[in-house]
Amino acid sequence: MPGKHVSRVRALYRRILLLHRALPPDLKALGDQYVKDEFRRHKTVGPGEAQRFLKEWETYAAVLWQQAEDSRQSSTGKACFGTSLPEEKLNDFRDEQIGQLQELMQEATKPNRQFSITESTKPQL
């Protein structure tokens, strides 16, 4: 069973990094780093928390895939990524998670992001 779990985690991790290729370069860099940190941080959690972790990241991957598809099919060529977080979900977060979320939001909405990556903004799915 542990081998199956490890391969599921790795496949999800790779899928998310592939999906991030559809993001603008600065958001891709931010997202990639966040995913790497979160997966590393959750390496040693218990089975219950691991299942919740995987479920949330699988949902994220599905939403990101749909947004990337919508972006590719859009006639305007303008990509729209992200979603609102319902208040009831926020109420389930621990204080540490709220802090992480706030830091991520601030970083993602900075006018001059710290990442200066120059590559094509065309999605590579």
UniProtKB/Swiss-Prot annotation:
Residues 1-30 form a transit peptide. Transmembrane segments: none annotated. GO terms for biological process: mitochondrial respiratory chain complex II assembly. Keywords: Chaperone, Mitochondrion, Transit peptide. One of its GO terms (cellular component) is mitochondrial intermembrane space. Pfam families: Complex1_LYR_2. It is found in: Mitochondrion matrix. Belongs to the complex I LYR family. SDHAF3 subfamily. Interacts with Sdhb within an Sdha-Sdhb subcomplex. Plays an essential role in the assembly of succinate dehydrogenase (SDH), an enzyme complex (also referred to as respiratory complex II) that is a component of both the tricarboxylic acid (TCA) cycle and the mitochondrial electron transport chain, and which couples the oxidation of succinate to fumarate with the reduction of ubiquinone (coenzyme Q) to ubiquinol. Promotes maturation of the iron-sulfur protein subunit Sdhb of the SDH catalytic dimer, protecting it from the deleterious effects of oxidants. May act together with SDHAF1. This is Succinate dehydrogenase assembly factor 3, mitochondrial.
